[in-house]
Amino acid sequence: MILEENKGMFALPGFDLIQYEGFKRFINQGLMEELLKFPKIQDADQEVEFLLVGDQYKLREPSIKEKDAVYKCVTYSSELYVPARLTQKRNRRIREQILFMGSIPLMTSQGTFIINGVTRVLVNQIVRSPGIFYSREPDHKRIPLYTGTIISNWGGRFKLEIDGRMRIWARISKERKFSIITLLLALGLTRKDILNGVCYPNILLDLWKRQDKDIKSSEDAIIELYKNLYCVSGDVTFSESIRKELQRKLFKQRFELGQIGRRNPNNKLNLNVPENESFLLPQDLLAAIDYLIGIKYGIGTLDDIDHLKNRRVRSVANFLQGQLRLALTHLENSIRQTMHKAIKRKRSLTPKGLVISTPLLTTFKEFFGSHPLSQFLDQTNPLAEMIHKRRLSTLGPGGLTRRTASFQVRDIHPSYYGRICPIETSEGINAGLITSLALHARVNDYGYLHSSFYNISDDEEHIVYLSPAEDEYYRIATGNQLASNWGTQEKQVTLARYRQEFLTIAWEQVHFRSLFPLQYFSIGASLIPFLEHNDANRALMGSHMQRQAVPLLKPEKCIVGTGLEGQVALDSGSVTRSTQEGQIVYVDGAKITLSLNDNETIDTELITYKRSNNKTCIKERPIISTGTYLKEGQLLADGTATVGGELAPGRNILVAYMPWEGYNFEDAILISERLISEDIFTSLHIERYEIEVRITNQGIEEITKDIPHLDSYVLRHLDSNGLVVLGSWVETGDVLVGKLTPQEDSLRAPEGKLLQAIFGIQVADTKESCLKVPIGGQGRVIDARWVYKENILINNAKTIHIYILQKRKIRVGDKVAGRHGNKGIVSKILPRQDMPHLQDGTPVDMILSPLGVPSRMNVGQIFECLLGLAGDFMQRHYRITPFDERFEREASRKLVFSELCEASEKTRNPWLFEPDYPGKSRLIDGRTGDTFEQPVTVGKAYMMKLIHQVDDKIHARSSGPYALITQQPLRGRSRRGGQRVGEMEVWALESFGAAYILQEMLTLKSDHIQARYKVLGAIVTGKPIPKPNSVPESFRLLVRELRSLALNLNYFLISEKDLEREMKNV
């Protein structure tokens, strides 16, 4: 239990603390721990000794700023310097030098890492905690077996099993097991030690008598263990190398518990082993056998392996410390080799001559580049960044695999309550394996998840953090009251949680109370208003789609929210705050100048048109004016998708739930052209194109404006250096960078020179390899720059980056969604005069299908749009905490109807609230002017445009690449692929009798090599399209496959003539 200093009221914890605290733990503890563990290195004669003075290490301040690291495509890191001492005992000479060990990537102020200019994040991994866990499992005959699983700190494991005949086995894999007696003897115990160290000696004595082989000594046991482990048959003689191999393979990988794992057997088996003893001892094994036999007799308890007390979080600190340990191991081996070679060749030794920085640099580079939990930061909007940093994954090295993970692992466990969100998880094969931290959850130094509760004892008031093992022993009342009601006991009986069950108990028996209703959910789920009225599946989709919302050109604050929007925007780092108190003296789009009281000024630079990882535009907008006096912490500028310091990924749109000529069938959505003309759903996207300039075998590639092979029109935007001019509007096919590549002259042979002289051929010694605007890439050029990467010496390459800004209005085919999982595709854009309009003449902006509500059970969208309508007319914003039914029944409905009624009275619009059909009003058809037959639900809903846009997905292919083996078109937009015609498509064409189209698709358009070239000529010349006259390539491939199986397949044409069958070989 951890007590907090603050009393009474509470503040929300920082949402990105899990990343910062992990890195802080690595820098303050893990780094020094690993450096101090670095061993003394001596030569074979023990005359030369090398030692690192780990406690005096220094980290140099980075030579580059965070934003410059992204701009210049380099790694944001700090150089590590450690003093080292080299002692030569023969002449008693000691040399000390400060060594450069390498660079360690630093965490940025946003809680991320910048590797080669790319923003990355380390996802926290939740794994089984090391220790021993007892369970009951069925064997292959479905007979229950009691097992004790010992999980090591490395993730390796082995099992102790007791079967129906009271035989105890040690199992390393499904196939291999051996008697526990063999293992105990191999550990160095004698028969007397074993029998004296257990509570059930008779069972072990009986087991000894029933052994197949007579094992008398430790050496015999080691040989038996070695033969079993490596499946060796025949006679094996004992040697020291066998002992070392077993120690390395078995004992080190499966017996090392670590500091965290040591606590588990101490508590479970009532042992007093010191916590710094990280390996499993023989006495631990004897106690574990005793407990296993006790469980067989009904004494002791089984463990729930999915309980959070048996799982821990591996955060940034664990990952980086593990990589540093690996790098120092490589360095140790390198020093030993260098020292051995130098002494052998009688060279002088210095500390700098022994240590190289390569192990540290390559280890971290490989880790951040290839580890599955080092991921591209999702930068679609600030919420996506925040959720990505708080993600928990059970996948990755040392974790589970998505193919073998069981339903029990994926399911919601009662211990998740207040620690892991029960709603937000991945859809599909990763369901339950990728989860998200709850709002008030935090990770302690040992990796266990804690949740906060409010102590309601009479003598003191404070907030406590309970671990998953602790909160089972307390009765905890659910979050059924707000902070303003703390201390009152208006309910004599309350609902409480005790030992993973819900009980109704007297108020005096409650130990703790939940802080507030949203503490059980993640950030994404907590931003959904009226969450309690939605089905959990739709709430999951809603939290996912908020992450996918594209920042808009003109964002707007939501009318109906939950109150967490400001905290998300603040903790994501997307808003800019003043660092000191002062007065604003200068403001423009790129800089804000603050004057302090002592006539000093501070300049705050704003981000303008920066590309995110997801190609969205990051831009900051100043929200204060010159002359404003500010205090420390006040807002200076809004960032991407924020308004007034609150998250704003969408717009408040006037929606109607009604069918309209079938155009909103099956989640299709009708929109008004007002959304286009007024840039309601217009977003900015930045695409980056790059081209390398290399030194080839034929010469250096040249960047130039003079490209003889191309038309001057496509070169019109190039400057004298061959780069595109900033501010140019470029279209598909325009050249962005003019480049000529030297090529080998094919006419240098004697016969080539003769032809050149006869025909007067001018030989082109270069070919154009320009960077051109691809299809759909038109836009405004906002930046063009040379980038000199860190590995420039390796491949002699320099890179040019061109950034193009696109302004995308909403189109047919774009995906839009609300916060309740109500998503759809834009099917038609209507003129505003044709849209249905309200009784005051306001045309509706969007028409949604009413059938999308009852079956999906996301009624929260109806509450939101009706309350939004009232707020729009009364110029109010609402921040509603979910689960307001704790105050009274139907509280949400009463609130919405009371606000609508007040709005109709204040604005003198009686149609806003009509008692006969509350929440609905009569709409007028914009085309005819008639009133619709039924009243329609109309309101202001907060809708978002998602990143799934038709511009990125639409694709057409006239001709393109073919696969080498099947000769069929490739698959996918990125490869300029074709449309797949599968079984169902063939059936559809067959059912309509479209024989010629079907034949074309299966032959001419696909893999009929000769015929497809003839088709192109026939289309150009206007001749009839020829029929295929031979077998397509896929059938030839099938024949070859069958022949490889020694099956010869011939195909014949059978015709009946004069009542005789005649076979012709095709």
UniProtKB/Swiss-Prot annotation:
The domain of life is Eukaryota
InterPro entries the record matches = DNA-dir_RNA_pol_bsu_ext_1_sf, DNA-dir_RNA_pol_su2, DNA-dir_RNAP_su2_dom, DNA-dir_RNAP_su2_hyb_sf, RNA_pol_bsu_bac, RNA_pol_bsu_CS, RNA_pol_bsu_protrusion, RNA_pol_Rpb2_2
The subcellular location is:
Plastid, Chloroplast
Query: Has UniProt tagged this entry with the keyword Nucleotidyltransferase?
Result: yes
Q: Name one GO biological process term.
A: DNA-templated transcription
- Keyword entries, A-Z: Chloroplast, DNA-directed RNA polymerase, Nucleotidyltransferase, Plastid, Transcription, Transferase
CC annotations in GO: chloroplast; DNA-directed RNA polymerase complex; mitochondrion
Q: By its UniProt entry, which PROSITE patterns does this protein fall under? A: RNA_POL_BETA (PS01166)
Question: CDD domains of this UniProt entry?
Answer: RNA_pol_B_RPB2
What GO terms are given for molecular function? DNA binding; DNA-directed RNA polymerase activity; ribonucleoside binding
Under catalytic activity, the entry for this protein gives: RNA(n) + a ribonucleoside 5'-triphosphate = RNA(n+1) + diphosphate
Q: Name one Pfam family in it.
A: RNA_pol_Rpb2_3
Keyword Transferase annotated: yes
Q: What is its EC number?
A: 2.7.7.6
Q: Which HAMAP family match?
A: RNApol_bact_RpoB
| Role of this protein | DNA-dependent RNA polymerase catalyzes the transcription of DNA into RNA using the four ribonucleoside triphosphates as substrates.
**What family does this belong to?**
Belongs to the RNA polymerase beta chain family.
State how it assembles: In plastids the minimal PEP RNA polymerase catalytic core is composed of four subunits: alpha, beta, beta', and beta''. When a (nuclear-encoded) sigma factor is associated with the core the holoenzyme is formed, which can initiate transcription.
The protein depicted here goes by the name DNA-directed RNA polymerase subunit beta
The gene from which this protein is expressed is rpoB
